[in-house]
Curated annotation (Swiss-Prot):
GO terms for cellular component: mitochondrion. It catalyses: L-glutamate + H(+) = 4-aminobutanoate + CO2. Induction: Up-regulated by salt treatment and hypoxia. One of its GO terms (molecular function) is glutamate decarboxylase activity. Transmembrane segments: none annotated. It comes from Arabidopsis thaliana. This is Glutamate decarboxylase 4. InterPro entries: Glutamate_decarboxylase (IPR010107), PyrdxlP-dep_de-COase (IPR002129), PyrdxlP-dep_Trfase (IPR015424), PyrdxlP-dep_Trfase_major (IPR015421). Catalyzes the production of GABA. The calmodulin-binding is calcium-dependent and it is proposed that this may, directly or indirectly, form a calcium regulated control of GABA biosynthesis.
């Protein structure tokens, strides 16, 4: 006699996920479910949802690394369960971080002797690195003001209006006035002359960007240093410089070694760089290094011993994974100076291919410079019928993610598209992207203008509008339209 289970008694674990009840139910969104589900079902359901994400390799908005060698992937997975802060338990991991700090500090020409340890720390990204550097500047300034018997309650920091949002966060979170140098059309970085004019006795530092997020351009740190040296002599101040090299720190030493932007300049006291950008490591790893030990106040360093040994620490968070630190060391020794230079050369060459291809269409004005971070920022020469937001939106149908955005004050009327060239963006992809841009433009040309029916002659309600006002209205319209499409879950494209 053969014994068998009926269908109703069958073990659900043998069912295909798509033959089970789990795909018939909505996924939990607000509360943890009461019952468990098989691991295969959990994986399949989540994996299916993630298919609707964009392809990271085609996300040309991001500077962040999206490809690493399989050997490095393996190293990262093998160390994914190591908590970096357990320094006594994982001393080799700590040693690898120290080696990275020393290599990066010397790459940036820190004044170190043979065998002398550099001062720096690994972070979860440049945002944390900038917070730490800013806190060091603020404490140094406060200590000096206290010693002189002067007020120390109104610190400020001078930057360009093109800074990344982490600078605004630092200013707001740590109560520092942010003094921004406004941009102007065709000059989208901080003007060193205007920056130095804004410096006063309460300025804790001037922040220069080596690789603007908006256009990839390097700010003139050498000129800023020279002007600030002169002002310090005249006033008796000692206002220092921080270089935000999040994007450019792993580019300039290899492509532009003669460019003076780092610790070769006497007023540069600290530098941050993103390992997860052109340091060629997956998100999130950043670094901040100081010129000398005296540039990092001792009172900001904590000492703990409840993990088994005395451990100095200067971070905003505590626990974090070790994988990215290990991956950074892998890249530094795997590629070496030669390898990094080759990667950056390739990025620059592919940037030029894309730049020249876009210029040949005759439809775009290139806003970015040839030197700097390998990216192309560009605007439509004629946006009277269709604008940059519409181009970016239509391009998504081909799989490409290309951002469109407006410039900061006083260049808000300028809208640009930006393509970041990363290590894994080949010449073939660059040529394909140009072809897809041409398809998008041809398609848009065959459509009626969606916005300018009322504005065809630059008039609304009988009032003549300037081109800048018209462009701002068009931009605002498209921003609102795209946000509506993103939030409307029932939209069918």
């Amino acid at each position: 006699m053969v014994l068998s289970k009926t269908v109703s008694e069958s073990d659900v674990s043998i069912h295909s996920t798509f033959a089970s009840r789990y795909v018939r139910n909505s996924l939990p969104r607000f509360e943890m479910p009461e019952n468990s589900i098989p691991k295969e079902a959990a994986y399949q359901i989540i994996n299916d949802e993630l298919m609707l994400d964009g392809n990271p390799r085609l996300n040309l908005a991001s500077f962040v690394t999206t490809w690493m060698e399989p050997e490095c992937d393996k190293l990262m997975m093998e160390s994914i369960n190591k908590n970096y802060v357990d320094m006594d338990e994982y001393p080799v991991t700590t040693e690898l971080q120290n080696r990275c700090v020393n290599m990066i500090a010397r790459l940036f020409n820190a004044p170190l002797g043979d065998g002398e340890a550099a001062v720096g720390v690994g972070t979860v990204g440049s945002s944390e690195a900038i917070m730490l550097a800013g806190l060091a500047f603020k404490r140094q300034w406060q200590n000096k003001r206290k010693a002189q018997g002067l007020p120390y309650d109104k610190p400020n920091i001078v930057t360009g209006a093109n800074v990344q949002v982490c600078w605004e966060k630092f200013a707001r979170y740590f109560e520092v006035e942010l003094k921004e140098v406004n941009l102007r059309e065709d000059y989208y970085v901080m003007d060193p002359v205007k920056a130095v004019e804004m410096v006063d006795e309460n300025t804790i530092c001037v922040a220069a960007i080596l690789g603007s997020t908006l256009t990839g351009e390097f700010e003139d740190v050498k000129l800023l240093n020279d002007l600030l040296v002169e002002k310090n002599k005249q006033t008796g101040w000692d206002t220092p410089i921080h270089v935000d090299a999040a994007s450019g720190g792993f580019i300039a030493p290899f492509l532009y070694p003669e460019l003076e932007w780092d610790f070769r300049l006497p007023l540069v006291k600290s530098i941050n760089v993103s390992g997860h950008k052109y340091g060629l490591v997956y998100a999130g790893i950043g670094w901040v290094v100081w010129r000398t030990k005296t540039d990092l106040p001792d009172e900001l360093i904590f000492h703990i011993n409840y993990l088994g040994a005395d451990q100095p620490t200067f971070t905003l968070n505590f626990s974090k994974g070790s994988s990215q630190v290990i991956a950074q060391y892998y890249q530094l020794i795997r590629l070496g100076f030669e390898g990094y230079r080759n990667v950056m050369d390739n990025c620059r060459e592919n940037m030029m291919v894309l730049r020249q291809g876009l210029e040949k269409t005759g439809r775009f004005k290139i806003v970015s410079k040839e030197n700097g971070v390998p990216l192309v920022a560009f605007s439509l020469k004629d946006s009277s019928r269709h604008n940059e937001f519409e181009v970016a939106h239509t391009l998504r149908r081909f799989g490409w993610i290309v951002p469109a955005y407006t410039m900061p004050a006083d260049a808000q009327h300028v809208t640009v598209l930006r393509v970041v060239i990363r290590e894994d963006f080949s010449r073939t992809l660059a040529e394909r992207l140009v072809a897809d841009f041409e398809k998008v433009l041809h398609e848009l040309d065959t459509l009626p203008a969606r916005v300018h029916a009322k504005m065809a002659n630059g008039k609304v309600n009988g009032v003549k509008k300037t081109p800048e006002e018209t462009q701002r209205e068009v931009t605002a319209y498209w921003k609102k339209l795209l946000e509506t499409k993103k939030t409307n879950k029932n939209t069918i494209c």
